[in-house]
């Protein structure tokens, strides 16, 4: 959670996550989603403008998503339609297409919709998606096939009475029961052998694992009933990279580097589906316009409607964290000019509005400049052929963050330049002088270019290699390395020095040129033009908020139950007396701590024994304090006491078992455990498997 909280200061004071209750806002907004912000003082026309802008951006996202996913899937869609349209052979085998991309995600919802539309155009009227992992027998499979689990088509329960062509997509085939898969394929194959049903069924396997792993798990009965053809889809990560490139170029709303990094981590680190990433992007757009009253400023500036920027907006703009930081920096200078500037910015609305427009335009220009520079450096990386390559989106994130000078990719480019030959070095200098170097660096680059050209003309050959290349396989000591290098021709040593000058000139350009090392969120009114608020996205999609609350409340219940100071004093007194407060802890807390220490499967009996031992520990401490001598009873009295102790022991054991079972039910209700069919005396963890 610390990684999330440290970013909240970026948008502090900009987003209102708890608007005024709708019942006090009038009838006009009693049914709408958007409500007046800024303490309920926002005019109604601005609320409607925020809603219209949000709808516009969401429609833009839908168009971009549809266009990008269709272009990415066009090849496979065309191949599947051609395969489904092929004439039926006389073997009577079930025609099957296996679609895979060797990743955790294969087909996605957009692909299903596009495939259904294309299949309908060529005569396949029904479209059914069947998740085999959720079924255990053929009857339940055919029941789902009848109704259409995806809701895109209806299939008659009596399959022999089919009169329309049907596309059947099988999901989770790698995780289902192999016997069920073989039986289903055998049943479908026997149906299509019927004279009336030949060519009426086309089966598609959605495979999420490499094809080689799937082949090894199949039996001869499966292979004898199908005629398969493999289609390799574009990986989900490639589709999402294309989607992000289109969003960056076309979407009206700009995303900051924090939200961009969160989006991309979803499909690289968590391997989420395409729909889940798009859903998160939609949620971020809605959050920006729903909770930010200043989200209309960019639209007003773009439309030149400066008169619509109200005094209420100007007052709110003065509370933006980036502007407050800008004012504090000017006050630290302390000269008369800075003091007058701050006074006019805080008191003169006309001057402040002019500066807001100018600063927002400068910020948008800065973003366009960084985007252009990211493309240039990305092309340079491909030209110098570095050992590792990253996507354009990674480049842009690094540039927006202002960390390009210290990034591993920049160092990799510099290392590649130090290993260039003379021909590539001349071409690299021409590219740098034309696209990257500015100001004094341009003149220095021309001087280096002239020096290198003269060195090549004076050398015995027109081809030079640096010392780094000639010594790359040398494994001697530093002293012997210097001795070997001293034996090289002078032109080679001078060429290596020229390459180092190029790298030094690049360092100067990155640090002091148009790029700089300052993050874009340091510019005033960054929060107004960019959405970079990660907390709602983490809480809604990363599942960190709910899990962290459950974890912290079970591990440290003293922060959630009773008076914290009183509990702290009780703990300190217990530590002084050599006792513990295990008996005070809730049963759920004790069970959860044992849960956290175990593996993926938990034996219920072992868990119960450990739970009872934890509860008995507190009672044993109390018994140790009772050291008063007592006379032992004799005769019938002893037998009666033994019977009472036995009844008491059974009663305590029954209470202990009930407490344990109640705690298990609480863990199940929270979604932390689930029963397993293989071992009835075990339960399985749903999270924290490691």
From Swiss-Prot:
Give Gene Ontology CC terms.
chromatin; DNA replication preinitiation complex; nuclear origin of replication recognition complex; nuclear pre-replicative complex; nuclear replication fork
| UniProt entry tagged with the keyword Nucleus | yes
Chief localization = nucleus
> A GO biological process this protein is involved in?
DNA replication initiation
Q: Does the keyword ATP-binding apply?
A: no
User: For this protein, what is any one GO molecular function term?
Assistant: DNA replication origin binding
Q: Which UniProt keywords apply?
A: DNA replication, DNA-binding, Nucleus
Q: What are the subcellular locations of this protein?
A: Nucleus
Pfam families reported for this sequence: ORC3_N (PF07034), ORC_WH_C (PF18137)
Recorded hits in InterPro entries, A to Z, give:
ORC3 (IPR020795), ORC3_N (IPR045667), ORC_WH_C (IPR040855)
Described by its record, this protein's role is as follows: Component of the origin recognition complex (ORC) that binds origins of replication. It has a role in both chromosomal replication and mating type transcriptional silencing. ORC binds to multiple sites within the ars1 origin of DNA replication in an ATP-independent manner.
User: To which protein family does this belong?
Assistant: Belongs to the ORC3 family.
Per UniProt, subunit arrangement is:
ORC is composed of six subunits. ORC interacts with cdc18, recruiting it to the ars1 origin of replication.
What protein name is recorded for this chain? Origin recognition complex subunit 3
Q: Which organism is it from?
A: Schizosaccharomyces pombe (strain 972 / ATCC 24843)
Q: Which gene encodes it?
A: orc3
